[in-house]
């Protein structure tokens, strides 16, 4: 790890949850942005159009 000295400044009990939490928030924001600005993504989540028999 080339940034191993960061843990001498930031306690791992604070830094690791903060890092994982920020990654989670960014992922949720990206999904919401795609969901609200495209038409194909909501259709993809719905599984496509079903054909009537």
From Swiss-Prot:
GO cellular component, as recorded: organelle inner membrane; plasma membrane; plasma membrane light-harvesting complex
Residues given in the record as a bacteriochlorophyll binding sites: 31
Keyword hit for Transmembrane: yes
Membrane topology of this protein: Single-pass type II membrane protein
Superkingdom of source: Bacteria
Cytoplasmic side: 1-13
Keywords, comma-separated and alphabetical: Antenna complex, Bacteriochlorophyll, Cell inner membrane, Cell membrane, Chlorophyll, Chromophore, Light-harvesting polypeptide, Magnesium, Membrane, Metal-binding, Transmembrane, Transmembrane helix
Transmembrane segments annotated in the record for this chain: 14-34
Record flagged with keyword Transmembrane helix: yes
Pfam families in the cross-refs: LHC
Role, per record: Antenna complexes are light-harvesting systems, which transfer the excitation energy to the reaction centers.
Protein name as catalogued: Light-harvesting protein B-800/850 alpha chain
Organism: Rhodoblastus acidophilus
């Amino acid at each position: 790890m080339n940034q191993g000295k960061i843990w001498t400044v930031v306690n791992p009990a604070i830094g690791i949850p903060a890092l994982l939490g920020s990654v989670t928030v960014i992922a949720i924001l990206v999904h919401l942005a795609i969901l609200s600005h495209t038409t194909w993504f909501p259709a993809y989540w719905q599984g496509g159009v079903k054909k009537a028999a």
